[in-house]
From Swiss-Prot:
Protein name from the UniProt record: Beta-ketoacyl-[acyl-carrier-protein] synthase III
EC numbers: 2.3.1.180
Coiled coil: none
Pathway(s) this gene product operates in, as recorded in its UniProt entry: Lipid metabolism; fatty acid biosynthesis
Keyword terms, alphabetized: Acyltransferase, Cytoplasm, Fatty acid biosynthesis, Fatty acid metabolism, Lipid biosynthesis, Lipid metabolism, Multifunctional enzyme, Transferase
Positions annotated as active site in the UniProt record: 116, 257, 287
UniProt cross-references to HAMAP family, sorted A to Z: FabH (MF_01815)
Cysteine-cysteine disulfides: none
Species lineage: Bacteria, Bacillati, Cyanobacteriota, Cyanophyceae, Synechococcales
Gene: fabH
Known catalytic reactions: malonyl-[ACP] + acetyl-CoA + H(+) = 3-oxobutanoyl-[ACP] + CO2 + CoA
An MF annotation (GO) of this entry: 3-oxoacyl-[acyl-carrier-protein] synthase activity
Source species: Synechocystis sp. (strain ATCC 27184 / PCC 6803 / Kazusa)
Gene Ontology annotations for the cellular component aspect, listed alphabetically: cytoplasm
Amino acid sequence: MNTLGSGLKIIGSGTAIADQSLTNQDLSNIVETSDEWIQSRTGMRQRYICSAQENLASLGVKAGQKALAMAGLQPEDLDLIILATSTPDDLFGTAAQIQGGLGATRAFAFDITAACSGFVVGLNVAAQFLRTGVYQRVLIVGGDVLSRWVDWSDRTTCVLFGDGAGAVVLQRQAQDNLLAFEMYTDGTGNGCLNLSYQANPQPLTAEKTVAQGTYQAITMNGREVYRFAVAKVPEIIEKVLFKAQLTTSDLDWVILHQANQRIMDAVGDRLGIPSEKIISNVGEYGNTSAASIPLALDQAVREGKIKEGDLIALAGFGAGLTWAASIVRW
């Protein structure tokens, strides 16, 4: 609970979708798969991927602009921009590119990497700047361009991932609408889901080498990721509800990382939460990593599902292994 006499509220949200739709039928022309095979295992019908003219920064700028418009703010009103991503356009950071693209000249900007938990982690990090009074308004962008790093010959992974970005604007206020949060890491499970650097040693002199190389395509142990998610996500949601002195019946909505419909169904069943309270758009967008939760959140807000005062559980989980959850009041 906040003990500093200062809280925060989400005052705007926005999304940006990549410009190319890739359907299950399209994928069946690339690898040995079918619409029935993909839908029965993942719930996905299509996903969107970036063309050569798009990148993470352009998606982040578009999502940020929409979030600012909903909030009724100008880019110059922002104090801080946090980008959650695992697929930056530049390894030195992409948040600064988004800051420049928005024209948010007053805002400090930095990247964080926490894979599919990244947006929730970014929300919890931003909250600390607001609660202490250091900043008044923060833009959080969750975005990934995973199509760059997919092995398009591997049908177990290439069917899963899409590209996109989602954003929210947080503003400091007296009442705290972030009621509780939890974050965890288990590095012993790191090998379950990877986008790894592979070094190729190159000689500099007769005695010295340098490990130059590149990143390899995404690899995943799907069975282990499923076991991890259905065990840890219900547990962390129960923990944040306990911290907030709430129960599952108090929740109006649950927004999970949109990894796979089977995982979301299993989490809902274990918590006894009706499926109509669990927001899902995985069928339309696939797994967009750090973008998935803000994409689902913004869509539900704009469709009029989420209303002022609603209690929402957000939970992300993924590579690391990391998992994080928050309870927010809209």
